[in-house]
């Protein structure tokens, strides 16, 4: 009877471990490729997306140059899903441009050091919906902002065109 209980426990542990592995696997694979890219961006330059261009006929511009490291829904720990798309420039913080992906109304709350949002009243893919594009990590580790002076803290509902320079990639979270 003890042997059956131990085998059952091992089976439960194996299945649980396999479930955790499957949950994290896509993120782990992306993390591995991201580390390769960050160690030597020039060696993987063909992995970079170009700022200001579109993917096929998509209405949105690529907001910055770099490697798309993490996607919406990636998991880094159980019960948590990433809520964004992280693009890594592979250069020194403050050097890689960040531009508006689509025209809309920009807001930067008074206490935001590294982030802004752009409200798009009519999603080009679903015109009956309003969406927001969110731009973040635009400051150094000490919180010194890389957002351009045109958008100081407290900016609210300022219209910007697609391609407008918003700031530069940083490494502040």
Protein language model regions, located:
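Beta-rich strand-turn-strand
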Residues: 145-173
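Hydrophobic alpha-helical segments and their boundary regions
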Residues: 5-6, 93, 152
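Mixed-charge, polar/low-complexity N-terminal
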Residues: 4, 79-81, 86-87, 140-141, ...
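Zn2+-dependent peptidoglycan hydrolase active-site motif and core
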Residues: 100-153
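Surface-exposed, glycine-biased beta-strand/turn segments
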Residues: 21-115, 121-123, 161-162, 171
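N-terminal Sec-pathway targeting helices
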Residues: 1-17
């Amino acid at each position: 009877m003890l042997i059956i209980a131990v085998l059952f426990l091992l089976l439960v542990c194996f299945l649980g471990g396999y479930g955790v592995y499957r949950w994290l696997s896509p993120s782990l694979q992306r993390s591995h490729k991201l580390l390769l890219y960050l160690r030597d961006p020039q060696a993987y330059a063909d992995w970079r997306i170009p700022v200001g261009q579109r993917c096929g006929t998509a209405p949105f511009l690529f907001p910055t140059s770099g490697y798309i490291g993490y996607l919406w829904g990636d998991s880094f720990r159980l019960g948590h899903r990433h809520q964004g798309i992280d693009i890594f420039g592979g250069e020194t913080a403050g050097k890689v441009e960040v531009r508006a992906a689509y025209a809309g109304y920009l807001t930067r709350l008074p206490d935001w050091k590294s982030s802004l949002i752009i409200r798009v009243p009519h999603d080009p893919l679903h015109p009956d919906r309003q969406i927001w594009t969110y731009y973040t990590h635009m400051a150094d580790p000490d919180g010194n902002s890389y957002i351009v002076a045109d958008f100081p803290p407290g900016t609210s509902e300022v219209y910007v065109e697609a391609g407008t320079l918003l700031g530069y990639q940083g490494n502040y979270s």
